[in-house]
């Protein structure tokens, strides 16, 4: 490496400007680049003086404002965040002991639940109408669900083969051989377990059915007097005193996709002319050093391209406390009191300006609303699996979302993103204390969104779903295994949340939300246990002689019975509950026009294919979710990796590794049932053959080529593909642009490349004052890093270096000034290729 000359060649200067720079040594070069002419005490600190010049040479369009400042030691720093104005945000400890709460009530310490006590009489009167309606509706839902379950369970009891329940007397069995007693009791024990599990699972299915049915009626009629979207006409002026922060917490995400969606969203906001009411905060918890540098570069490009200086901010936390919820809490403590509202965006979120301004207007029209959740539509993926899921959520999702709103009204869900939140009550009431105790269900809350909604409602604020507000989008995982990775952490989080079921002051609706969150995953092991007991009952029936006489001196035998007409009727009614919501969804599309879904025939064929696909995947999800639930109870660690946000196919090796046990179970199950009773295999066929085919379905459905073929055939077509909204078109266009100029190996470029080193140095957040002890630590970090090979420098050590401007400057200086001493670093860097487009567009 010809140090000075090669260094100068990397600077974005004209030939004349390059020729004017000294080439004698690196210290002189950095002093020449230092416009202020400061003399640094240490030779290897000289790059600190040239940071400002190197930044302005490369990123002049991004630095038009007052972003460049000096820290207390005179080092150049990019002011990536506004000045903090701190607020206190402390969580209340959880009180989950119902006995203690009952004792407080006896002593008169708790007169009203907290969600009522926080309201004035006028506010109570204003909300009493919809609250009463919601309560009546939920009692009706409970009555419908329970009555339907009772009837179905009675039918189930009558079709079970062993009907001698009333004749079993444990006292009569005490004097007989234990094996005889076991043979008498075993079928009835199995049947009792089957009946209990059937009742629970049928009740769960019934609740979903009535939710979808009411959503269908709501959407078919088209009028909802309690819809929060009806509270504005959509063109009211926004109060300039009520500003909104768009916050996007990210962690090791696809940088190109994140900033493409964010740019499209911001440009859509600008198109409304209301951008003065909004600021954007990118809140990074990334701990991959290469991604951290890529985020900094992408932020600088975004500011330059949308003229976002002073309105688009970036921050990377060095201490990742409480993950996403802690990141949001940290924002609220430092900058929350500067805003009336905040909209939480996920890394894959895209929202139109009309949707965002509409959410703000809804907040202003409903001063008692604490959270308003939009209904994001899934789009943007090309694998067969993702397109099938997009179609399902786009077709069936509106029914269930409208149905949830019908039953819950202002005591509804919050899904953690694409929602607007009133900041002041969120700060005052929604801080999350860790769950007490030890074990896998203690500590920081993992799934924070449902809990924050419950706390907001407990404090007296409404939580609404604006199910009919368009312009909110998200992406789904591209394949089954990536979806299951996400499900694993959601499963653990929902199981943790159930510990809050008895917490003081929670609204009954949100207690039910915690219960349904648990059942979303607990239903899988219950279903598996139901199938296992049914199989065991069939084994007992096939291999043992029935016990016809269950009591001494019994005159008539108890014959095992089979009533196929009732079994078929019960099976048919269960299938109606499961599949009628899908049919109602398509009927709704037929009524309102199926053109955007490919036309009448294609949307119908897509429905049938999606039903087949869901039948194939349901047993696979059942087994995975069963493992997730068991692992959570056993305390196995849950790894919070960011889900794959891009189209990605599953390799055959991974598919057989993940699904191999399911394939084996399906084969053993099928062969065993075929040997025992071929007729029973007919009933189990959808289960066992789905398990046998699971690795093949997983791989084939993960391929974008198959998905794009169905797209050409207009199968699984959704309106966002038929007529893409501008914000999604822009997202795709900016994603292609970002891909063409993406930065790989960001940390190494931050050490070597003049421009990226200047950016990393100016963005470093460890701005300490002069300290002899700190200097010793810095030298130790730099020496240890450079004396090892780059491959041996682990992630945590790289992050320590990247967070300190002095260590980044010293490493930069040393590898250029003494390449022979640090040849392992120089040789490694020379093997890396910097994307030529990564800097050419700036």
From Swiss-Prot:
Its EC number is 2.4.1.-. GO terms for cellular component: plasma membrane. It is found in: Cell inner membrane. Keywords: Cell inner membrane, Cell membrane, Glycosyltransferase, Membrane, Transferase, Transmembrane, Transmembrane helix. GO terms for molecular function: hexosyltransferase activity. It is an enzyme of class 2 (transferase). The keyword Zinc does not apply. Involved in the biosynthesis of osmoregulated periplasmic glucans (OPGs). This is Glucans biosynthesis glucosyltransferase H.
